[in-house]
């Protein structure tokens, strides 16, 4: 169920290539202390973060978000094709969308210290954004992120072949299965194919029943996304980030995307090896992929709040 906000404003922003992007602004009831922009994950949409946005607004933050290309109301605004970024360079185009959306939001609502919060696919987009625009960011929070592995390189090559042979806009059952079929392996008493998302059965059921969630993305989408995975771990790209940018990596200890924590620490090590001075990791015991939807999500909220306030976590 969508939360009701007296202080919520919806926008449709036009990108430089003519694509329409659906975005939302949530206004705090008191003085604005900063700006947090939320980047949602694959196969979902921005409205799933309204509870988190409400919490952040109560703290005094201006909170904004948008639906990526091929997702949510952005997909509906552009012909209804889900799970497709662009005809070419889709990952970079989606990162550029973030920049253009933020530029327009800041023209409308002012320049405040900016924190980028990215979940899952959104965390990979945030990691690339930080490589290109770190001077415009005050902080970055990567939620449910993971490491790039040799399997992503293999998947990238396969997705490119599938895009050429079967069509770029064809839903990729093969890539979807290769990407997600193993995610429930360590979960006891599996009920649905999406149990890996969260331990809260009601949240999983809401995801399943949401028509804008859980769709199978296209061949070209998987090619674009894996291309992004490969690019963001290149040392020369990581070194583009200003060394003093604070980065928080948060994840569930039972999140398969982060390899149950191993991949998250690998990402942190890559940042530290590149000379970054302020990288923090926080794992939440017993939580899965969507930690801000877990039963004990307040633990996550509290850690984010303390980190934003420069307090020990």
Regions from the language model: what does each represent?
Residues 4-30:
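N-terminal cap/lid segment of alpha/beta-hydrolase-fold proteins
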Residues 40-44, 120, 253-254:
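Active-site glycine-rich loops that stabilize anionic/oxyanionic intermediates
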Residues 53-81:
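Conserved alpha/beta-hydrolase
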Residues 85-106:
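Alpha/beta-hydrolase active-site loop
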Residues 109-120:
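Alpha/beta-hydrolase fold nucleophile elbow
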Residues 126-212:
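Alpha/beta-hydrolase-fold enzymes
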Residues 249-251:
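Short beta-strand/loop motif that positions the catalytic acidic residue
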Residues 274-313:
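Catalytic active-site module of serine/aspartate enzymes centered on a nucleophile-bearing elbow/loop
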């Amino acid at each position: 169920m969508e939360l009701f906000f007296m202080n919520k404003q919806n926008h449709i922003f036009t990108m430089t290539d003519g694509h329409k992007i659906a975005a939302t602004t949530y206004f705090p009831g008191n003085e604005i202390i900063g700006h947090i922009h939320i980047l949602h994950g694959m196969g979902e949409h921005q409205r799933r973060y309204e509870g988190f946005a409400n919490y952040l607004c109560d703290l005094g933050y201006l909170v904004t978000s948008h639906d990526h290309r091929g997702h949510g109301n952005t997909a509906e605004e552009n012909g209804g094709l889900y799970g497709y970024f662009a005809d070419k360079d889709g990952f970079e185009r989606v990162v550029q969308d973030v920049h253009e959306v933020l530029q327009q939001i800041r023209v409308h609502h002012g320049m405040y210290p900016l924190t980028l919060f990215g979940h899952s696919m959104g965390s990979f987009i945030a990691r690339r954004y930080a490589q290109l625009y770190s001077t415009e960011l005050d902080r970055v929070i990567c939620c449910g992120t993971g490491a790039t592995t040799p399997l992503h390189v293999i998947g990238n090559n396969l997705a490119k072949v599938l895009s050429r042979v079967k069509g770029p806009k064809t839903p990729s059952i093969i890539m979807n299965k290769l990407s997600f079929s193993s995610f429930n392996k360590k979960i006891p008493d599996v009920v649905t194919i999406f149990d890996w998302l969260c331990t809260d059965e009601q949240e999983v059921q809401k995801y399943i029943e949401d028509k804008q969630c859980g769709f199978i993305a296209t061949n070209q989408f998987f090619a674009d996304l894996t291309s992004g995975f490969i690019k963001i771990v290149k040392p020369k790209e990581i070194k583009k980030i200003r060394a003093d940018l604070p980065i928080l990596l948060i994840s569930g200890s039972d999140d398969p995307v982060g390899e149950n924590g191993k991949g998250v620490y690998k990402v942190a090590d890559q940042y530290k090896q590149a000379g970054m001075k302020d990288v923090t990791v926080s794992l939440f015991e017993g939580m899965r992929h969507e930690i801000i939807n877990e039963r004990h999500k307040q633990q996550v909220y509290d850690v984010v709040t303390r980190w934003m306030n420069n307090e020990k976590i």
